[in-house]
Amino acid sequence: MEKIKILGIAPYQEMEPLMRDIAKSYDNLELYTFTGFYKNAIQFAKAFPDKEFDVIVSRGGTADLVRSLNDTPVVKIKVSTLDLLRVITQALQCSSRAAVVSYSYITDRVEMLAKFLRLDIRTFSFETPEQIEDTVKQCARAGYDLIVGGAATRDYAVAEGAQFLLITSSRESVEASIQQAIEQHHLINDVLDKN
């Protein structure tokens, strides 16, 4: 049986060994991983010709950017509601002036959780990677001393003198994405075989 070649782009260092550990449970999988986000992830993905990998797995804005620049199918690692609840709870235990700075599809869910669970956490949204720095500065100027966000937000938060908590994806979320990548590869091959 031919192995499925997946490129895993981990947005933070701890995800890379998690991806490799999950991949061990699949006999038909050849996983290549590296840690990177946005520009360095795109440079890495572009270094490989299209179709060198069967599927690329990544998260957030990095997955969106890689998808727009590459013909290889991209599966996005999800951030579950439990992942968000975990980091929000931790943030509120550390500071009463905590805020989430992320894409609107994340901050909308945080606002829903905050309203439902009566949590006092503010959100600041951005839509493109180019907006991250200004959004973090806006958050810091508003007096928030702990910023919760993705890997690309970290450096800007630290530069503003804020504490930072990373939104991480659970093992279950990463595992589901790898499984989805395998299923997507099989589906594409089935369609190509019929043509």
Model-derived segments and spans:
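Non-catalytic structural scaffold of enzyme domains
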Residues: 1-195
